[in-house]
Amino acid sequence: MRAAINRANSLGGLFSFRFIRNIKSMSSSTSQDFVSRPVIKKVFAKLQKEGDGAVVRRGISRSEQKLLDPFLMLDEFSVSPPAGFPDHPHRGFETVTYVLEGGITHQDFKGHKGTIYAGDVQWMTAGRGIIHSEMPEEEVNKGLQLWINLSSNEKMIEPNYQELSHSDIPKAEQNGVEVKVIAGESMGIQSPVYTRTPTMFLDFTLQPGAQIHQNVPESWNAFAYILESGEGGGVFSSSNSSPIPAHSVVVFGPGNDGVSVWNKSSSKQLRFVLIAGEPIGEPVVQYGPFVMNTQAEIDMTIEDYHYGKNGFEMAKYWRSQ
């Protein structure tokens, strides 16, 4: 049981969509007349082994959770067959899996099966319990997985999911800046996705010399993760700041201003995701793939999983194919 529980970094699974609120404060601009939230922490995501032979860069871990409520974890993953993320459970949070290259095939114990490819998104609400597998579809498979906490009154809801094709993700381009709006709003366009925990998830690409200012609701926590950057490229918050390398998390401080970013590379594009969310403000107790509010709830979750009850009824019998 513990071996399955400790496969804590699964790649997404189940998710639901509703229409997003019209949040005007989430617009963006490519002009220069803005003050940005400050950068309060930078973390370089080092390589580590995860799952069954997979490799991840863990950008957010428990040391960043207090600064980034409601976010629990961010992994940049790379996996090739026969490695992967075999059968494992979840309870109490959501996951967002964004495939950058290749494909990931998902199966769960409720009979769902599907594959998402480069540019596709899978948004999972694990709720009261899910067991699933996530395995590579092609020779090279890369992407991001974000874990988003659920409030106490939603941790035991029924799990559900849906997939969003890359062609369904709204896109905009202006002055050398392209954005893919996975959740939230930017450049006057907004995603059809509404998450249970209000969340912004934007994929920006800045050409050499381009810049962007993205507004973020004042009460939300925000961070960026840099996917690609050339020498001297990614500069955040102040145009005089030092560039930050690829595979780094940039944590922004509080404020009623948004986030400003410059690509100062002369030859290479800057690609990063900007992620922000409304804090839940509740205690977080995590045991691997289970995230609850108290230790007693974690103990009950382990018991439920072990004995196959309260959402884990299929735990003893189901195996992915």
UniProtKB/Swiss-Prot annotation:
Stretches of the chain forming a coiled coil according to its record: none
SUPFAM superfamilies membership: RmlC-like cupins
GO MF term set: metal ion binding; peptidase inhibitor activity
Pfam families, sorted: Pirin (PF02678), Pirin_C (PF05726)
UniProt GO cellular component terms: cytosol; nucleus
Disruption phenotype: No visible phenotype under normal growth conditions, but mutant plants show increased resistance to infection by the bacterial wilt pathogen Ralstonia solanacearum.
Any one Gene Ontology BP term: defense response to bacterium
Stored InterPro entries: Pirin, Pirin_C_dom, Pirin_N_dom, RmlC-like_jellyroll, RmlC_Cupin_sf
Annotated Fe cation binding sites: 88, 90, 132, 134
Homology family: Belongs to the pirin family.
Record text on subunit structure and interactions: Interacts with RD21A, RD21B and XCP2.
Protein name per Swiss-Prot or TrEMBL: Pirin-like protein 2
Protein species of origin: Arabidopsis thaliana (Mouse-ear cress)
The gene coding this protein: PRN2
